[in-house]
C-alpha cells in the first residue's frame, strides 16, 4: 500500500499497530512515509527520540521557538502553524490550529481502546471528584486519570495518549473558560458516563450568566453514548433545571433532597475525616468513610460512587473504596506544622468553594480560627458580591482573625470587619507573611484559600520554614 500515510500515535505499551486510512484517522496530517510515534509532547524539555513535538503559540511562550531544538533532540516530526527554521520541510506538519490537531490525534487514538471512562466537569469540585472516581475505579482494575488539573485542550489529549491495552478504567477531568470547549473535549474523550458536580459562578466573567455556565457544562452530553448515565447534583439550585437529553440516564445525587437517587445521610465530619450512609434507590444502603473534612466533599464522593455503580460496578465495593481517596496538591489538605493545624486549599477558589472551606474551619472545636483568604478570579460582575459574601461567611464561621490578600479582597475585608472580625487587608505576599508571624501561634487552625494565581501555595511553604520543626 502506498502513501499518504497518517501520523499515528503508538506508545510503547501498545502491542499492536492498526492500519487506518488517513481520511478516517487524521484528515490533514498526512506524511510521505509510514511512521510509528512513541510520544506526543508539547514541552520541549520532554522531547525524546521518536516523539512528535506540537508547537503551541502562547501568550508568554511560543512553542515554535523551541521546535528546532526539539528536532535536534530527536523529535521525529514537528506539528506547527507555519514553517520553522531549522526543521526540514519533510519533518514539519503544517496545521492551522495546533489545539485542534492535537484533539484530533487524541480522539482517534482513544478509539483504539475501550475502557469504562468517567468524564467530570462542573464549576467546583472537579478535581476532588476526579480523585474519588480514581479511588473507586482503581479497586476494580488498572485506571488512568487526569494528572493534576490538566483539563484543557492540551491536558485532555495528554491524558488520552497514556491509554494502553491494559487500561480498564479511566477518569478524565474537563474544564473550560468559554462555551464550546467542553463539547470539544467530551467528543475527544468519549466517556462512558458523565458527572456535573455543580453550577456556580466560576467563569462568569467570560460567560455572563450562570444559565450560560449551565449550558456550557451540559455540553458534556454530546460525547456520551446513548443510555449513558449523567450524574448531577440535585441540591444545586440550577442543575435540576437542566434539559437532560432523553437518550441519557439522569442520576441525581445529594444530601438535602429526599428524592435523590443516591443520597448521603447521617453525615459526621471532622479533621480526621467524614462518615456517612449512602442510600441508593437502586442498590441499597451502605456505610461510607472518606479521609476528607467538610460536607462539600461528601458530594464529590457521592458523584463518584453514583457514576461507578451506574457503569455496572459492585455498589458495596464502590462505597468501601471511597476510603482510599488521596488528596492531591494543596486541596483540602490538613497538615500540622509547629503545633498549628493548616487547612491547605490553595489551588483555586470561588464563592461556593470558599463557603465550603469556611464550614470546615467552623467545625474545628476548641481552637482559635485564622483565615488567610485571597482574591477569587474570573467572577466578572459577581466579583464584589462574591468577596463581600465571603467576608460575611468568615464571620459566621467564627473566624477570629482574617487576613485578606489581594485587591479584590478589599470587599471581603470590609464585610468581615463590619461583622466584628479582626481583619487586615494585605496588598503583597510580604505583608501576608508579616501578619502570619504576628497572629499565628501553636494551637491555632489556619485556613488558606485563594485562586491559584495568588500564589498562596508558595507563601505557605515560605512560612512553614519559619515554624519549629517536629
Residue positions per predicted region:
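Acidic, Mg2+-coordinating active-site environments of NTP-dependent enzymes
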Residues: 80, 84-89, 195-342, 366-367, ...
Amino acid at each position: 500500500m502506498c502513501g499518504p500515510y497518517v501520523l499515528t500515535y503508538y506508545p510503547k505499551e501498545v502491542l499492536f499497530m492498526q492500519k487506518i486510512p488517513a481520511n478516517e484517522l487524521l484528515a490533514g496530517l498526512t506524511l510521505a512515509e509510514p511512521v510509528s510515534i512513541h510520544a506526543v509532547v508539547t514541552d520541549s524539555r520532554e522531547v525524546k527520540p521518536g516523539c512528535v513535538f506540537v508547537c503551541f503559540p502562547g501568550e508568554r511562550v511560543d512553542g515554535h521557538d523551541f521546535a528546532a531544538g526539539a528536532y535536534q533532540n530527536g523529535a521525529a516530526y514537528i506539528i506547527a502553524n507555519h514553517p520553522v527554521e531549522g526543521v526540514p520541510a519533510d519533518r514539519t506538519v503544517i496545521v492551522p490550529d495546533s489545539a485542534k490537531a492535537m484533539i484530533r490525534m487524541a480522539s482517534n487514538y482513544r478509539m483504539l481502546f475501550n475502557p469504562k471512562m468517567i468524564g467530570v466537569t462542573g464549576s467546583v469540585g472537579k478535581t476532588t471528584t476526579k480523585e474519588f472516581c480514581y479511588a473507586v475505579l482503581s479497586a476494580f482494575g488498572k485506571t488512568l486519570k487526569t494528572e493534576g488539573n490538566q483539563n484543557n485542550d492540551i491536558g485532555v489529549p495528554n491524558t488520552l495518549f497514556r491509554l494502553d491495552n491494559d487500561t480498564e478504567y479511566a477518569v478524565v477531568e474537563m474544564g473550560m473558560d468559554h462555551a464550546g470547549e467542553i463539547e470539544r473535549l467530551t467528543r475527544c474523550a468519549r466517556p462512558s458516563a458523565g458527572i456535573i458536580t455543580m453550577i456556580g459562578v466560576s467563569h462568569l466573567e467570560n460567560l455572563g450568566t450562570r444559565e450560560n455556565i449551565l449550558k456550557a457544562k451540559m455540553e458534556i452530553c454530546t460525547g456520551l453514548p446513548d443510555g449513558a448515565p449523567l450524574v448531577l447534583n440535585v441540591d444545586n439550585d440550577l442543575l435540576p433545571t437542566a434539559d437532560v437529553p432523553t437518550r441519557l440516564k439522569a442520576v441525581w445525587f445529594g444530601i438535602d433532597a429526599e428524592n435523590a437517587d443516591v443520597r448521603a445521610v447521617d453525615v459526621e465530619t471532622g479533621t480526621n475525616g467524614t462518615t456517612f450512609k449512602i442510600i441508593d434507590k437502586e442498590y441499597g444502603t451502605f456505610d461510607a468513610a472518606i479521609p476528607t473534612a467538610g460536607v462539600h466533599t461528601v458530594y464529590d464522593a457521592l458523584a463518584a460512587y453514583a457514576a461507578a455503580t451506574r457503569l455496572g460496578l459492585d455498589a458495596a465495593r464502590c462505597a468501601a473504596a471511597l476510603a482510599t481517596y488521596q488528596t492531591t496538591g494543596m486541596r483540602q489538605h490538613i497538615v500540622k506544622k509547629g503545633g498549628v493545624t493548616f487547612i491547605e486549599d490553595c489551588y483555586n477558589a470561588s464563592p461556593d468553594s470558599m463557603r465550603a472551606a469556611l464550614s470546615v474551619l467552623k467545625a474545628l472545636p476548641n481552637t482559635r480560627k485564622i483565615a488567610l483568604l485571597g482574591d477569587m478570579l474570573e467572577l466578572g460582575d459577581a466579583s464584589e458580591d462574591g468577596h463581600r459574601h465571603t467576608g460575611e461567611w468568615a464571620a459566621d464561621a467564627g473566624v477570629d482573625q482574617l487576613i485578606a490578600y489581594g485587591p479584590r479582597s478589599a470587599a471581603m475585608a470590609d464585610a468581615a470587619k463590619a461583622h466584628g472580625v479582626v481583619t487586615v487587608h494585605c496588598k503583597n505576599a510580604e505583608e501576608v507573611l508579616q501578619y502570619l508571624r504576628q497572629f499565628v501561634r501553636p494551637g491555632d487552625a489556619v485556613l488558606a484559600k485563594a485562586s491559584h494565581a495568588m500564589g498562596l501555595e508558595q507563601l505557605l511553604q515560605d512560612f512553614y520554614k519559619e515554624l519549629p520543626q517536629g
